[in-house]
A protein has these predicted regions:
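Juxta-kinase regulatory segment immediately upstream of eukaryotic protein kinase catalytic domains
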Residues: 1-39
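Conserved ATP-binding subdomain of kinase catalytic cores across diverse folds
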Residues: 24-132, 156, 160
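Short, glycine/acidic-enriched loop or turn micro-motifs at the edges of active sites
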Residues: 129, 170, 188
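AlphaC helix of the protein kinase catalytic domain
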Residues: 133-141
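Conserved alphaE helix
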Residues: 146-157
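Conserved catalytic-loop position in the HRD/HxD motif
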Residues: 162, 167, 185
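Hydrophobic residue at the +6 position relative to the catalytic HRD Asp in the kinase catalytic loop
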Residues: 168-175
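C-lobe/activation-segment region of protein kinase-like
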Residues: 176, 180-231
């Protein structure tokens, strides 16, 4: 069940079935660091923590800009309403994807702090246990032909539901110890029926794999799974 807190420019939405004793202090980075509730993670440009709360492990992400505006605005975005914030859009998309029974993290809470014309935002998702990033899984030499095909099938299921992942790369795909693939970090992602976005998403993954995996056979692997996905 979704619960909403509004207080002096603060907008918080949380899943009360997942976090039963919610306290907005879990969005306070100073508090969670001093209380030893978290550890910092290196995940892209966002400030990200692994958070231990109520005997569950969560991923806390603070939204940060990239590209040209990063140095100017850093973590601030133009405010046009709570529903239009990056955090709320990612919340809504993850909830929608869950209804398709696709492998994504469960969203737990979001926070939006409004200023005069701008806002800052955070998102908390439940950690998917016993997983590692695709990049590490491949480097461990566990990625065989069967698993490449399984990855292709997983991506195809997302695309068939019209889900465009805006930053599909080797860090945003997780592999569980039972060899199941998960997609994470859906910031700026959306649902569309335009196939060009799915090809754009796959092209991003292609570049990420070629850049990070020094294997002369990687291009052939990618060509094979591309055929499976878009056939």
């Amino acid at each position: 069940m979704e619960k909403i807190i509004k207080d002096n420019g603060l907008f918080i939405k949380y899943n009360s079935k997942l976090i039963k004793n919610f306290d907005k202090k879990i969005f306070n980075y100073d508090y969670i660091e001093k209380a030893a509730l978290s550890k910092s993670l290196e995940v892209g440009r966002a400030r990200t923590f692994e958070l231990n709360y109520e005997n569950n492990i969560y991923i806390l992400k603070h939204y940060h800009r990239g590209g040209f505006f990063q140095k100017i605005f850093r973590d601030k975005y133009i405010y046009t309403g709570d529903v239009n914030t990056r955090a709320n859009k990612e919340w809504a998309l993850l909830k929608k994807i869950k209804t398709y029974d696709l492998p994504v993290p469960e969203v737990a809470a979001i926070k939006v702090k409004k200023y005069i014309f701008t806002y800052k935002a955070d998102l908390i998702t439940k950690k998917i246990n016993n997983t590692i990033q695709l990049i590490d899984f491949i480097k461990s030499n566990k990625m065989n032909d069967k698993l490449w095909e399984k990855l292709a099938i997983t991506l195809k299921k997302f695309f068939e539901k019209g889900i465009y992942h805006a930053d599909l790369n080797v860090n945003n795909i997780l592999v569980s110890d039972n060899e199941k693939f998960y997609l994470v970090d859906f910031d700026k992602s959306f649902i569309t029926d335009n196939e060009k976005y799915f090809k754009k998403s796959f092209a991003r993954l292609h570049r990420s794999l070629v850049k990070n995996i020094k294997d002369k056979n990687i291009e052939n692997k990618l060509l094979s799974i591309k055929k499976l996905i878009f056939s």
